[in-house]
Design a protein with these regions (language model features):
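Acidic, Ser/Pro/Thr-rich low-complexity regulatory regions
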Residues: 1-135
């Protein structure tokens, strides 16, 4: 997270998570853009903040893999929609995309007897969160 975001008011992510727990679905690109605008954040800053919050909550045992993975998938779909809307030269937000990839790696059993979440997702998230300790 850059210093510009740290100097801004932190968005009320608790309200987002409360809505998600009550069954609210992130409604896509328009919702993210509206929420970002309401909190004077860029969409990239919001996607990164949400993704880091999900990763932190999952690693702290506050979210199940299924819930965290579902949110990561939704955020990735929004990232892809933005990429299509912006065309050539658009870069996916980091660490949001890396967090999506970490959860994606835990989605399927490779047949080697290991838990893919423990073997792939958790180490990747530890590395990402170590690189972003301010979250």
């Amino acid at each position: 997270m850059n210093s510009e975001m740290r100097n801004r008011e932190t968005p009320d992510l608790e309200s987002v998570f409360a809505d998600l727990r009550s069954g609210y679905q992130l409604s896509g690109r328009e919702w993210v853009h509206g929420f970002a605008d309401a909190h004077s954040l860029s969409v990239v800053e919001l996607l990164n903040a949400l993704s880091l919050a999900v990763a932190n909550r999952f690693m702290a045992g506050e979210m199940t893999f299924e819930d965290a993975d579902g949110i990561a998938n939704t955020l990735c779909a929004i990232m892809m929609d933005d990429a299509v809307a912006h065309g050539d030269g658009f870069e996916l937000p980091e660490p949001a995309f890396a967090i999506y990839e970490a959860f994606d790696a835990g989605e399927w059993d490779r047949g080697d007897g290991s838990d893919p979440v423990e073997r792939y997702t958790m180490p990747a998230l530890r590395m990402i969160l170590d690189e972003h300790p301010e979250t």
